[in-house]
Design a protein with these regions (language model features):
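N-terminal start-of-chain detector that recognizes signal peptides
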Residues: 66, 73, 87, 111-112, ...
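A broad, low-specificity signal for short, low-complexity segments enriched in glycine/proline
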Residues: 62-63, 97, 109
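Internal/C-terminal transmembrane anchor helices
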Residues: 58-83
Length: 173
């Protein structure tokens, strides 16, 4: 039979893994990462230090739990950062394809699907997630001014705009 400390660590690992998947791939928000950081700093750190005074075994279990939750929080932030970097690279490729389309046809495409298959093989997703914020939004203007291309870096707000002609980024919350 497993020791009580190992059972608690196994439960903490499962909880941390579930929160990681929910936060990084379903919500695409650092909500649970921030909650986990707060729990580690406000509960586990003081509780571990307090337990060190009398029960080193309990302190080790609490320290291990703190490490598990801290690792989950950091992993969420890293995953979301990697997803946003991936979306940035894909937006630049879409912008380049729009500029190539304009050079050939003397106007911007009406939508991103007009770029397929001549300029890009398919319209990519911005990020991977289940609750939105995973696609690029493209708005073409009638007067052939630069179209708008953005994705939700931090749903439901936090839009990251790519300016094709200047090859620069803007941010709107």
């Amino acid at each position: 039979m497993a020791e009580p400390g190992k059972k608690r660590l196994r439960a903490s690992t499962i909880i941390a893994a579930v929160l990681y998947v929910v936060d990084a791939f379903i919500l695409s928000l650092p909500f649970f990462a921030l909650v986990l950081l707060a729990v580690v700093l406000l509960y586990f750190l003081p509780a571990t230090l307090w337990a060190l005074r009398s029960d080193r075994r309990l302190a080790r279990v609490r320290g291990a739990k703190a490490g598990i939750y801290l690792l989950a929080a950091v992993s969420i932030f890293v995953t979301l950062g990697l997803q946003n970097s991936m979306a940035d690279r894909r937006a630049v490729k879409l912008g380049d394809a729009c500029l190539a389309y304009r050079a050939k046809y003397h106007h911007y495409p009406r939508n991103l699907e007009a770029l397929v298959p001549e300029f890009i093989p398919s319209v990519p997703v911005a990020k991977y997630g289940l609750l939105g914020g995973n696609r690029f939004i493209y708005l073409s203007r009638q007067d052939d001014r630069e179209p708008m291309l953005w994705y939700e870096a931090l749903p439901p707000f936090g839009r990251r705009f790519y300016h094709m002609e200047s090859r620069s980024w803007g941010y709107l919350d």
